[in-house]
């Protein structure tokens, strides 16, 4: 995602500036799979389930969470001799999602909206918006930022807005529910 866009994720679908983004064909999400028997090596290859995706107890029937493409999930679900059920895993709220200093109620599948800063663009700063941009302003753009008596100060001056010096990018992996990406560490500076 590029600077100046607003990102939102709804039910695992990425929206940029309010428009749904086409999912990559190989995007994986986690599915809860109730196995009746172990998945054969041949079927694992067909659904592209790697050895590292397999839990240790894979050699016996039971309920497991696997990263699968929608096509692989359909194929596994259609094999009633192997899988009793295949359902998309609904991730709970994560406290460690960006911004970590704000309780948003967001999940990896339902996130945002968040504006991705662009060089020369200005954002209005309030105590509500500050958690989204504080790290960028302080760490990446080397400013002294503080809050005193409910007011925001940048480099000793009271600030109600901030103009970014750099472009920022939003990184997301194809294995959406198993990716350490910008949902966890925020926008990435151009440098």
Residue ranges of each PLM-predicted region?
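Extended hydrophobic leader/signal-anchor segments used for secretion and membrane insertion
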Residues: 2-191
